[in-house]
Every structure is written in C-alpha cells, then in structure tokens.
Amino acid sequence: MPEKLRIGSRSELPAEGEAREFEIGERVVCVARLHGEYSALDNVCPHRGGPLGQGVIEGDKLVCPWHGWQFDPKTGAVGHAPDQCISTYPLTIEDEDVFVEIA
C-alpha cells in the first residue's frame, strides 16, 4: 500500500521548466515542473546513476546532468530506451504542504 509522505512546502517547488531534489529519509525524489504541472519521479538515472533533480528541462524532457539521457517527467519513459523507464509517484499539494505517494 502506498505511503503518503510530505516532501516540503509549496514555496520549495521548482519554477516552470526546472527540476529539484527532495529528500525523504534515505530516498531522494526529483520533482519537475513542466507546462504548469508538477511531476515526481525517481531521482536516479538508470544509465549511470546521475541525479535527475540536478538536471534541466529541454523542450518536454528532463535531461540527466551526467550523460544527457532524456526522460518524460510525467511517465518516466526514456526517449531512446523505453525498457529503462523510471518510477513516477503521485504528487499532491494540500494547502502549503507537498506530498508524494511511494509504495
């Protein structure tokens, strides 16, 4: 059963076209904002373990800062390697608090 965890406050969320890392215990989650919507996904690139929350948004893709792998921030799909999809997590905002649901 998924656990709803607070990752921060609304004021800490990334600006449009940016990504940011959030620590939840020993786990780090990437939150990206694209077209006014926030997406939460695994922070680790499956290629070499790059920190996706330190990446940039180019067009509609989140780009890993280490080797340029590109991810759809909503689905976690990798453009050139669909078998390397990363996990995404439901994100909700309640008043000023931001939560993700992690199984």
Predicted feature descriptions by range:
Residues 82:
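Glycine/small-residue-rich loop that forms an oxyanion/phosphate-binding "nest" at active or ligand-binding sites
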Residues 1-59, 72-73, 77, 85-103:
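N-terminal pre-ligand scaffold of iron-sulfur
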Residues 45, 64-67:
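Short cysteine clusters
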